[in-house]
Amino acid sequence: MPAKKKVAAVVKVAPQAGQATPAPPVGMALGPHGVNIMEFCKAYNAQTEGQRGNIVPVEITIYEDRTFSFVLKTPPAAELIKKAAGIKKGTENPATHKVGKISKDQVREIAETKMPDLNANDIEAAMKIVAGTARSMGVEVEV
């Protein structure tokens, strides 16, 4: 069995799917660690090509020999909610000003998408998490 590589750093960035470039935020996050930024951008863009239009967070593990590996996460719940509600951004005052509406089916769909990254045991708990995020953005959730 080969020896394990020593981890030098773990970096999290959230570029647009299929559109990562060496410019900030990717370049600023990886540059100080001496990683080949273009190599990462090409690999990331190839893996996220089918999800264009979404923000796809990625956790990059950088090793001492300047190699890297990365794990793709699911898009942020807020982004999925904005897309489902058809709004550009949430409200500053969710208690009084509602900016959109999503159905229970849309909440379930978002919860199923986010399930691998949420610390919920079942889909119902995941739906509660997503509904809470929606309410905090000023998006009404239909029961």
Swiss-Prot record:
Entry keywords, A to Z: Methylation, Ribonucleoprotein, Ribosomal protein, RNA-binding, rRNA-binding
InterPro entries: Ribosomal_uL11 (IPR000911), Ribosomal_uL11_bac-typ (IPR006519), Ribosomal_uL11_C (IPR020783), Ribosomal_uL11_C_sf (IPR036769), Ribosomal_uL11_CS (IPR020785), Ribosomal_uL11_N (IPR020784), Ribosomal_uL11_N_sf (IPR036796)
Free-text description of this protein's post-translational modifications in UniProt: One or more lysine residues are methylated.
Keyword Protease annotated: no
Disulfide bond annotation, renumbered to this chain: none
CDD domains the UniProt entry points to: Ribosomal_L11
GO terms assigned for molecular function: large ribosomal subunit rRNA binding; structural constituent of ribosome
Domain of life: Bacteria
Pfam families the record matches: Ribosomal_L11, Ribosomal_L11_N
A single GO BP: translation
Function: Forms part of the ribosomal stalk which helps the ribosome interact with GTP-bound translation factors.
Protein name: Large ribosomal subunit protein uL11
Native species: Cutibacterium acnes (strain DSM 16379 / KPA171202) (Propionibacterium acnes)
Higher taxonomy: Bacteria, Bacillati, Actinomycetota, Actinomycetes, Propionibacteriales
